[in-house]
Amino acid sequence: MKQLVSMEDLTNEEIYSLIETAIEYKKGNKPNKFTDKYVSNLFFENSTRTKCSFEMAERQLGLQEIPFETSTSSVKKGESLYDTCKTLESIGVDALVIRHPQNDYYKELEGLNIPVINGGDGSGQHPTQSLLDIMTIYEEYKDFKDLNVLICGDIKNSRVARSNYQALTALGANVKFAAPGEWVDESLDAPYVKIDDVIEETDIVMLLRVQHERHDGELSFDPHEYHEKYGLTKDRYNRMKSEAIVMHPAPVNRGVEIDSDLVEAPKARIFKQMKNGMFLRMSVITHILAEKEEGVIFDVAN
């Protein structure tokens, strides 16, 4: 795996391999340290979980991080994304983690000779979020075939919905969407349903934040009405299968996508997803750098 910009780039075998490595890290297996490697995290959108998770993963792997802040960089002087990245490559950075508001920004970076890991591009792709979600599901079910997955919320503007739909469908899951009519994404070939019609048969309920920053113009939005129609209420939670799970990529708007009392309820896996994120991102970085250097993944001395 030379880089990771889209879930469409991964085969099912590669997905399983990444998950297996992440699980080994989670069990305590020691990584092969990349102490002579440099990484830079370029976040052009706000982030808590993804940015901090990558930073933790990089430290666990022994990588040396070259700090980058958009507010103090030459981007403010009009420098292009490509020239910024080419500059970092030129001074010796070995890999880049990038989040950017532009869909498919990585297509402009094909002239780079170092790997790019996509930390999210507009409403396009969020591959490491999808992989950590898949890891979380795998730990619960060990298989994806015929699992019923319901993704609820702002489908049209969600890179998480797109990445997870593509990956979970390829792995054999049955994916359905629930969303207001104006947030339907017709490019994704999944049925749209009413939550109350399918909640009892669903194995995974995946809730999405409303992407206010990606809506053009004024957004007519009533949080209470949205919660009643598309959120996970206590009644819906109680109607779920006993073994079903609740997921959310976060940040969570309590009382909107999900009742506040349910965020840490027994079926919720929201904070487990966050924990898995560090191990999964360690796995992604390791697979990319180990392949680049033809090295080993685990420290054989441990």
Curated annotation (Swiss-Prot):
L-aspartate binds at residues 77, 159, 209. One of its GO terms (molecular function) is amino acid binding. The keyword Transferase applies. Pathway: Pyrimidine metabolism; UMP biosynthesis via de novo pathway; (S)-dihydroorotate from bicarbonate: step 2/3. Its EC number is 2.1.3.2. InterPro entries: Asp/Orn_carbamoyltranf_P-bd, Asp/Orn_carbamoylTrfase, Asp/Orn_carbamoylTrfase_sf, Asp_carbamoyltransf, Asp_carbamoyltransf_Asp/Orn-bd. One of its GO terms (biological process) is 'de novo' pyrimidine nucleobase biosynthetic process. Carbamoyl phosphate binds at residues 49-50, 99, 126, 129, 250-251. Keywords: Pyrimidine biosynthesis, Transferase. It catalyses: carbamoyl phosphate + L-aspartate = N-carbamoyl-L-aspartate + phosphate + H(+). GO terms for cellular component: cytosol. Catalyzes the condensation of carbamoyl phosphate and aspartate to form carbamoyl aspartate and inorganic phosphate, the committed step in the de novo pyrimidine nucleotide biosynthesis pathway. Heterododecamer (2C3:3R2) of six catalytic PyrB chains organized as two trimers (C3), and six regulatory PyrI chains organized as three dimers (R2). Belongs to the aspartate/ornithine carbamoyltransferase superfamily. ATCase family. This is Aspartate carbamoyltransferase catalytic subunit.
